[in-house]
Swiss-Prot record:
Comment block on domains: A Gly-cisPro motif from one monomer fits into the active site of the other monomer to allow specific chiral rejection of L-amino acids.
Motif (Gly-cisPro motif, important for rejection of L-amino acids): 135-136
This enzyme's EC code(s): 3.1.1.96
Alphabetical UniProt keywords: Cytoplasm, Hydrolase, RNA-binding, tRNA-binding
Alphabetical list of InterPro entries matching this protein: Daa-tRNA_deacyls_DTD, DTD-like_sf
GO CC annotations on file: cytoplasm
Primary location recorded for the protein, binned into one broad class: cytoplasm
Name this protein carries in UniProt: D-aminoacyl-tRNA deacylase
Main function: An aminoacyl-tRNA editing enzyme that deacylates mischarged D-aminoacyl-tRNAs. Also deacylates mischarged glycyl-tRNA(Ala), protecting cells against glycine mischarging by AlaRS. Acts via tRNA-based rather than protein-based catalysis; rejects L-amino acids rather than detecting D-amino acids in the active site. By recycling D-aminoacyl-tRNA to D-amino acids and free tRNA molecules, this enzyme counteracts the toxicity associated with the formation of D-aminoacyl-tRNA entities in vivo and helps enforce protein L-homochirality.
PANTHER family in UniProt: D-AMINOACYL-TRNA DEACYLASE 1, D-TYROSYL-TRNA TYR DEACYLASE
Subcellular location per the Swiss-Prot or TrEMBL entry: Cytoplasm
HAMAP family: Deacylase_Dtd
Protein backbone atom coordinates (compact mmCIF):
# COMPACT_ATOMS: atom_id res chain seq x y z
CA UNK A 1 0.00 0.00 0.00
CA UNK A 2 1.22 3.45 -0.91
CA UNK A 3 -0.18 6.71 0.42
CA UNK A 4 0.97 10.02 -1.00
CA UNK A 5 0.21 12.54 1.75
CA UNK A 6 0.01 16.27 1.20
CA UNK A 7 -0.36 18.81 3.99
CA UNK A 8 -3.11 21.15 2.84
CA UNK A 9 -4.79 24.39 3.85
CA UNK A 10 -7.88 23.20 1.95
CA UNK A 11 -8.86 20.49 -0.53
CA UNK A 12 -11.90 19.09 -2.25
CA UNK A 13 -12.80 16.32 -4.63
CA UNK A 14 -15.64 16.60 -7.11
CA UNK A 15 -17.38 14.07 -9.33
CA UNK A 16 -19.49 15.36 -12.23
CA UNK A 17 -19.35 18.86 -10.74
CA UNK A 18 -20.60 17.76 -7.29
CA UNK A 19 -18.35 18.05 -4.22
CA UNK A 20 -18.12 14.59 -2.62
CA UNK A 21 -15.35 15.25 -0.07
CA UNK A 22 -13.75 18.38 1.31
CA UNK A 23 -11.31 19.88 3.77
CA UNK A 24 -12.56 23.39 4.33
CA UNK A 25 -10.07 26.25 4.66
CA UNK A 26 -8.75 26.20 8.22
CA UNK A 27 -5.46 25.61 9.98
CA UNK A 28 -4.28 22.35 8.32
CA UNK A 29 -5.45 18.99 7.03
CA UNK A 30 -4.11 16.02 5.08
CA UNK A 31 -4.94 14.86 1.58
CA UNK A 32 -4.17 11.13 1.30
CA UNK A 33 -3.93 9.64 -2.20
CA UNK A 34 -4.13 5.86 -1.68
CA UNK A 35 -2.77 3.15 -3.99
CA UNK A 36 -3.28 -0.57 -3.38
CA UNK A 37 -1.19 -3.45 -4.72
CA UNK A 38 -1.88 -7.19 -4.97
CA UNK A 39 -0.54 -8.35 -1.59
CA UNK A 40 -2.21 -5.66 0.52
CA UNK A 41 -4.75 -6.70 3.16
CA UNK A 42 -6.90 -5.31 5.99
CA UNK A 43 -4.02 -5.51 8.49
CA UNK A 44 -1.84 -3.39 6.22
CA UNK A 45 -4.66 -0.86 5.76
CA UNK A 46 -4.97 -0.60 9.57
CA UNK A 47 -1.20 -0.12 10.03
CA UNK A 48 -1.12 2.52 7.30
CA UNK A 49 -4.00 4.40 8.93
CA UNK A 50 -2.15 4.38 12.26
CA UNK A 51 1.05 5.58 10.57
CA UNK A 52 -0.74 8.45 8.83
CA UNK A 53 -2.68 9.43 11.97
CA UNK A 54 0.56 9.67 13.97
CA UNK A 55 2.78 11.19 11.25
CA UNK A 56 4.24 14.48 12.55
CA UNK A 57 4.15 16.67 9.43
CA UNK A 58 1.87 19.45 10.66
CA UNK A 59 3.01 22.72 12.22
CA UNK A 60 5.05 22.45 15.42
CA UNK A 61 5.79 18.78 14.63
CA UNK A 62 2.20 17.80 15.39
CA UNK A 63 0.29 14.89 13.89
CA UNK A 64 -3.30 14.75 12.67
CA UNK A 65 -4.02 12.76 15.84
CA UNK A 66 -2.53 15.50 18.02
CA UNK A 67 -4.72 18.27 16.65
CA UNK A 68 -7.67 16.43 15.09
CA UNK A 69 -6.76 17.53 11.58
CA UNK A 70 -9.24 16.43 8.89
CA UNK A 71 -8.17 13.86 6.29
CA UNK A 72 -9.45 13.56 2.72
CA UNK A 73 -8.89 10.05 1.31
CA UNK A 74 -8.82 9.63 -2.49
CA UNK A 75 -8.11 6.34 -4.29
CA UNK A 76 -5.19 6.61 -6.73
CA UNK A 77 -4.21 3.44 -8.62
CA UNK A 78 -1.61 5.39 -10.61
CA UNK A 79 0.68 5.37 -7.56
CA UNK A 80 1.61 1.88 -8.79
CA UNK A 81 2.43 2.97 -12.34
CA UNK A 82 5.64 1.56 -13.81
CA UNK A 83 7.56 3.78 -16.25
CA UNK A 84 10.71 1.64 -16.57
CA UNK A 85 10.09 0.77 -20.23
CA UNK A 86 8.80 2.85 -23.06
CA UNK A 87 6.79 6.04 -22.87
CA UNK A 88 3.53 4.66 -21.53
CA UNK A 89 3.13 3.59 -17.88
CA UNK A 90 1.89 0.11 -17.05
CA UNK A 91 -0.45 -0.52 -14.13
CA UNK A 92 0.26 -4.22 -13.49
CA UNK A 93 1.33 -3.60 -9.89
CA UNK A 94 -1.98 -1.90 -9.03
CA UNK A 95 -4.59 -4.20 -7.51
CA UNK A 96 -7.83 -4.59 -9.48
CA UNK A 97 -10.84 -2.61 -8.29
CA UNK A 98 -12.48 -5.61 -6.61
CA UNK A 99 -9.41 -5.92 -4.36
CA UNK A 100 -8.51 -2.25 -4.00
CA UNK A 101 -11.90 -0.70 -3.22
CA UNK A 102 -12.54 -2.62 0.03
CA UNK A 103 -8.98 -1.86 1.18
CA UNK A 104 -9.29 1.88 0.50
CA UNK A 105 -12.59 1.73 2.43
CA UNK A 106 -10.87 -0.20 5.25
CA UNK A 107 -8.11 2.43 5.40
CA UNK A 108 -10.66 5.27 5.66
CA UNK A 109 -12.70 3.35 8.26
CA UNK A 110 -9.57 2.68 10.33
CA UNK A 111 -8.79 6.41 10.34
CA UNK A 112 -12.34 7.07 11.51
CA UNK A 113 -11.98 4.56 14.36
CA UNK A 114 -8.79 6.37 15.42
CA UNK A 115 -10.82 9.57 15.72
CA UNK A 116 -10.15 11.24 12.37
CA UNK A 117 -12.67 13.44 10.60
CA UNK A 118 -12.48 11.55 7.30
CA UNK A 119 -14.02 12.36 3.96
CA UNK A 120 -13.47 10.42 0.75
CA UNK A 121 -13.63 10.57 -2.99
CA UNK A 122 -15.60 8.02 -5.04
CA UNK A 123 -13.67 4.87 -5.92
CA UNK A 124 -13.22 4.39 -9.66
CA UNK A 125 -14.90 7.68 -10.56
CA UNK A 126 -13.43 10.36 -12.78
CA UNK A 127 -12.56 12.80 -9.99
CA UNK A 128 -11.27 16.33 -9.96
CA UNK A 129 -9.07 17.04 -6.92
CA UNK A 130 -8.32 20.63 -5.95
CA UNK A 131 -5.99 21.55 -3.13
CA UNK A 132 -3.97 24.32 -1.58
CA UNK A 133 -0.71 22.64 -0.59
CA UNK A 134 0.67 23.99 2.69
CA UNK A 135 4.45 24.24 2.79
CA UNK A 136 4.54 22.45 0.42
CA UNK A 137 4.81 19.22 2.37
CA UNK A 138 4.38 15.97 0.43
CA UNK A 139 5.42 12.56 1.81
CA UNK A 140 5.18 9.07 0.30
CA UNK A 141 4.28 6.34 2.81
CA UNK A 142 4.67 2.69 1.85
CA UNK A 143 4.05 -0.57 3.68
Amino acid sequence: MRVLVQRVASARVTVAGETVGEIRPQSQGLLALVGVTHDDDDAKAQRMAEKLWQLRILDDEKSAGDIGAPILVVSQFTLYGNTAKGRRPTWNAAAPGAVAEPLVDAFAAALGRLGADVQTGVFGADMRVELVNDGPVTVLLEL
